[in-house]
Amino acid sequence: MGPDSTLALGEGAVRGRLELGVCLRGGRSVASRQFHEGALRVLRPHYLDESGQVGYVMVNPGGAYLGADLFLIDVTVENNAALLLTTQSATKVYRTPGSFAEQRMSVRLGEGSRLELMPDQLIAYREASYRQNSRISLHPTSSLIMAEVITPGWSPDGASFKYQEVRLRNEIWIDDENGAKLLALDNLLIRPPLGDVTGMGFMEGFSHLGSLVVVDPRVNQGLADELDLIARDFDAYTGMSLTATIAGSTGLVLRSLSNSTEELNNLLGACAGVLRERWYGQAPLNLRKY
């Protein structure tokens, strides 16, 4: 089905759907299930090193999200498998008059598995509304590193905040033999028309926002302090928080404000790079997209 088609789903039309399952086979992580329909797909898998971690690049052939577009992404990383999931380019949200573009993502991580979710930046243009809802379920022994950068798109008068709304909601659950427990509800809502988001107490005069979420049994206050020190080397305003510990697993949320996409990407990359090297003996990510 081509990128201009729409797919029926209950309350509305689905612009694109992607399902990806990854398992461990012969010492390497490989796709166990792969399905795409409409305006989403993945490129051929790649391996950046000898760790066995598989990398996939998500592609939206249409290049942008428009009003009433709905994209569905379903990812499963099976026991002991490792997945790096990124995008080919920035996610661009254009005018969405009378509606909003939406992405819904469901992620399940099995025992001893790991996922690095490292998309390119989200760019919200003039009069754009965008909602992103993610539900992530982890085994207590699995590991998640998830980064996100939000930037305002160009507008004719040069002002930064001309989009209508950006709403990012992450539900993170720990699921074991005793059932699922909510570890974190990370809800970010920016509505420029309803107030001065550039002022003190919200964006602190900055225009770009970066977020890093880490969930792992090795997350603790010492790690949070270390990442905070790393963040101070960048031209950004950064805060850090820890979740409660559930079944031995803890979450960390880092938020950074800056006026530069590159600065935020470098900051988040530096923090993720420390974890890759320490936990898995891997080099910092170099996805060579540019």
UniProtKB/Swiss-Prot annotation:
The keyword GTP-binding does not apply. This is Urease accessory protein UreD. InterPro entries: UreD (IPR002669). It is found in: Cytoplasm. Belongs to the UreD family. It comes from Paenarthrobacter aurescens (strain TC1). UreD, UreF and UreG form a complex that acts as a GTP-hydrolysis-dependent molecular chaperone, activating the urease apoprotein by helping to assemble the nickel containing metallocenter of UreC. The UreE protein probably delivers the nickel. It comes from the Bacteria. GO terms for cellular component: cytoplasm. The keyword Chaperone applies. Keywords: Chaperone, Cytoplasm, Nickel insertion. It holds the Pfam family UreD. Its main location: cytoplasm. Required for maturation of urease via the functional incorporation of the urease nickel metallocenter.
